[in-house]
Amino acid sequence: KDGALIWKWNNGSPNRMLSPAMCTPAAHNGIVYIAAPDRYLTAIDAGTGATLWRNKEATVRESTGISEDGSTIFGKTMNDEIVAYKTQSTDPGILWRLNLGFGYEHVPSMLIAKFGQVTFGTKNGVVYSFDPLAPKLLWAHKIDNSMVNTVNVLSDDTTLVATMDGVVTLLKTR
């Protein structure tokens, strides 16, 4: 327990523009999930650092989140869609797709699953929230014209948001 390195992982790309430089890993049951600009969703064994699977079906880029119960990993694609995958050690393929129509997207912020909804921001200053079980859009609110950082869902009806332009907003969502 001294902070010693256990393992390192990379996707094999020497180009930092394609490496997982801005991803925030999610984990469940000994598996780490990441999405890098190479547009693969990758599952890594948390004990060994070995790649378990890589999936490029939906071209997820850097933005992921995990369900409250850990059973589902969510990814934001570069065009309009949120995709979901079951968390497991073999490639599950896409569980579902939800077209939210947000357009071209590249903000590396997390999708936050809390209080039965998943909430995230986009490069155009719009915050979205969807029901991961339906799946369907619950609400969307434009707060600015710049990139939205990872949101802070405070309660089932209150979300705190900041943008790259320095705008801080508290949203009442119900």
Regions from the PLM with identified roles:
Residues A4-H28, W53-D69, D91-K114, A140-D156:
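Extracytoplasmic beta-rich repeat domains
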Residues T122, L133-R174:
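Hydrophilic extracytoplasmic domains
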Residues V32-I34, T72-G75, Q117-F120, Y128, ...:
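Conserved beta-propeller blade signature
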Residues R39-Y40, G125-V126, D157:
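Short loop/turn microsegments at loop-to-beta-strand junctions
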Residues V32, L41-I44, G49, V127:
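Hydrophobic packing within well-folded, soluble alpha/beta domains
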Residues K1-D2, D45-T48, K86-D91, D131-P135, ...:
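Short loop/turn segments that connect beta-strands within beta-propeller blades
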